[in-house]
């Protein structure tokens, strides 16, 4: 059985993912974003992409799922550009895994 992938963010940033067959969840506001990420986790989504702009407002929700195996919550830039939050998280995880920042 295939695992599901979803993307959460503002409408303009997430609609393009629909063409790739990814479930899209446009949100407005932090409360809606939190509820959407929680709903995806409960509905067995293996990967949840969240735009960096949305992630800024729901940091505690993102951190809660970082401690879990699934879903993998991955931050991506929005159509407004990157905040470098996602890349910083990748860098931190690599450093934690190998003991040194190789990026």
Swiss-Prot record:
InterPro entries: ATPase_V1-cplx_f_g_su, ATPase_V1-cplx_fsu_bac/arc, ATPase_V1_fsu_sf. It holds the Pfam family ATP-synt_F. GO terms for biological process: proton motive force-driven plasma membrane ATP synthesis. Coiled coil: none annotated. The keyword Cell membrane does not apply. Keywords: ATP synthesis, Hydrogen ion transport, Ion transport, Transport. It comes from the Bacteria. One of its GO terms (molecular function) is proton-transporting ATP synthase activity, rotational mechanism. NCBIfam families: PRK01395.1 (NF002384). Belongs to the V-ATPase F subunit family. Produces ATP from ADP in the presence of a proton gradient across the membrane. This is V-type ATP synthase subunit F.
